[in-house]
Curated annotation (Swiss-Prot):
This is Outer-membrane lipoprotein LolB. Keywords: Cell outer membrane, Chaperone, Lipoprotein, Membrane, Palmitate, Protein transport, Signal, Transport. Belongs to the LolB family. It comes from Psychromonas ingrahamii (strain DSM 17664 / CCUG 51855 / 37). Pfam families: LolB. GO terms for biological process: lipoprotein localization to outer membrane; protein transport.
Amino acid sequence: MKTFLPCLFFLLILVGCAQRPTPPATKTADWAAHQQQLNDLTDWSLRGKIAIITPENRHSLNIYWQQSGDNFHITLTSFLGSTILDVKKTALSTRIIDDQGKIYFGKNTQTLMTRLSGIELPVEVLQQWIKGNPIGAVYQLNENNQLVSLTGQDNKNENWSANYQDYKTVQEISLPHQLKLTRQDLLIKFAIQKWLLEKTEIF
């Protein structure tokens, strides 16, 4: 009995150590490593669906987004496949083709998109936010070190909030597949069907 009690005490200590929660420092390191993956992810594309909802209107569209460094190409189409807006942004300028085939050029992508289509999309900050990278924002993580929500500003200093509902692993990187973006009475829902993580020649 005298031998049994010390052994039992030793086993209880081992069990307690095994069940000890992950130290905050380790979780911080895990998030830092994941965010570095997202920072390094500069060439990618996605396709999915987007719903833009206001008290007056609701638009349901397909979205195709190709990103190469700081340049991007976004195409919004109807469910029947007709182009609503085609946006190409480079370091020099933004070129937009509307649903009538007319071509426009400008410097501020977000402002030009809104003026031509009425669609308010914070594309400059969304380049990072859509990957789950909260650059320039206040954010919260879940127990898996995935972004749950963020609050930040676009390049017009307007406040936006984002909530992330679903993640899937794509080539060993955890990426969002559903998110909601809100600004006052504007709600934008993304349902991402596919991510492609490779360089594409789009410019």
